[in-house]
Amino acid sequence: MSLFDHSVSELHKKLNNKEISVTDLVEESYKRIADVEDNVKAFLTLNEENARAKAKELDAKIGAEDNGLLFGMPIGVKDNIVTKGLRTTCASKMLANFDPIYDATVVQKLNEADTITIGKLNMDEFAMGSSNENSGFYATKNPWNLEYVPGGSSGGSAAAVAAGEVLFSLGSDTGGSIRQPAAYCGVVGLKPTYGRVSRYGLVAFASSLDQIGPITRTVEDNAYLLQAISGVDRMDATSANIEVGNYLAGLTGDVKGLRIAVPKEYLGEGVGEEARESVLAALKVLEGMGATWEEVSLPHSKYALATYYLISSSEASSNLSRFDGVRYGVRSDNVNNLMDLYKNTRSEGFGDEVKRRIMLGTFALSSGYYDAYYKKAQQVRTLIKNDFENVFANYDVIIGPTTPTPAFKVGEKIDDPMTMYANDILTIPVNLAGVPAISVPCGFGANNMPLGLQIIGKHFDEATIYRVAHAFEQATDYHTKKASL
């Protein structure tokens, strides 16, 4: 039995009782990485020397009264979250040798909580993708079946947890990039409310949509991690100065009287029968615990995919303009003049999907098209947000599938961008509205790959979605299933 089959609270107790050491946890992580990483390919950079040195320091503090629950816990960090002195590439050749000079706020908070960073995790380049096949280095595979994708863009973050390489990880979610891979890999992934977690030190893709969040084996562990990284940050003007509650207090298993909304759009056209049936079965479980549900409508969700790609690509076009060989990124040697420097650096440094998004965004922002595309997309975004607010006036949570289908095979959709983009039709509306959502395991498809249940909450009401997710988790055994890699 792996140490990582235990929860954070169980490991914390074992540490305090000196049944195990922090070094044991770190070595467990690196041993597992040595065993499976050649197949999974979840990591881009390992932090072995520093991690072992920190473990030795923390071993001397075991048993101290001020040791928090995350003391000594091994974590993986998505490679678009900067880590001082530890290579951060965004899975792009553009940043292949970038060593940050500061820590992201979330990394700083976890360091203060005495977690240990095991390494940096693979992803779709600059977080643009749904399968991890867009990494500029190599594709991560799904631990449940290496022929399948782990999802994206936080595919490395989800795969590392599912494979038992780390206890938990950090990902980022712009249109579903935490929840979708969590669903595909059979783990728990939360996208917090926009502004709940500081984005300082997150390499920007789409600044009005990006959020950092936790990926874990269980809901309880997820709540511990969010508790540690949440809060206002003076380094991020978009972080919200709203009190962070106690997310653990509501994990009672009680959902009696809870009002659940189920959008008909989330169970209709484009959603596979397996995903639909798994959600209906989950609703039956929650009904048996005293919750009630009704069908509702989110009428503008059908426009979410187009709206998202116009807004996110426009913001990416602006954000990625800094990678030009002068300010950031590699510099092409194949230059005769300044224009060659810009053009060749970006042509050689960016992958195809990043170039596609930049071109789309530049077009949407260009003179003569701004009003017709970008401005119109922002107006539709407001309508989508209003749909959520109207539903939440009468219901506590919204529930549906995380993804339309289970994971698909490597190479199956990479040459068809529109089919690939459609994997996120159920997660994208949440980002556009800025509300929180969690994915928890809720079943398996005919291909024996995991399915995820998405629970969506009101702004800054992560506590309620944790309560529902935990109650469902405790009433079922899906979270106990492990990839057999």
From Swiss-Prot:
* Coiled-coil spans in chain: none
Q: Name one GO biological process term.
A: translation
- UniProt keyword Ligase, yes or no: yes
**What is the main EC category here?**
ligase
- State a GO cellular component annotated for this protein: glutamyl-tRNA(Gln) amidotransferase complex
- Catalytic positions? K78 (charge relay system), S153 (charge relay system), S177 (acyl-ester intermediate)
Q: Which reaction does it catalyse?
A: L-glutamyl-tRNA(Gln) + L-glutamine + ATP + H2O = L-glutaminyl-tRNA(Gln) + L-glutamate + ADP + phosphate + H(+)
Record's keyword terms, sorted: ATP-binding, Ligase, Nucleotide-binding, Protein biosynthesis
According to the UniProt entry, its GO molecular function terms are:
ATP binding; glutaminyl-tRNA synthase (glutamine-hydrolyzing) activity
UniProt-listed Enzyme Commission number(s): 6.3.5.7
- For whether the record's keyword set contains ATP-binding, the answer is yes
Q: What does this protein do?
A: Allows the formation of correctly charged Gln-tRNA(Gln) through the transamidation of misacylated Glu-tRNA(Gln) in organisms which lack glutaminyl-tRNA synthetase. The reaction takes place in the presence of glutamine and ATP through an activated gamma-phospho-Glu-tRNA(Gln).
Family, per entry:
Belongs to the amidase family. GatA subfamily.
NCBIfam families named among the record's database cross-references: gatA
Q: How does it assemble?
A: Heterotrimer of A, B and C subunits.
Entry protein name: Glutamyl-tRNA(Gln) amidotransferase subunit A
Give the organism the record lists.
Answer: Bacillus cytotoxicus (strain DSM 22905 / CIP 110041 / 391-98 / NVH 391-98)
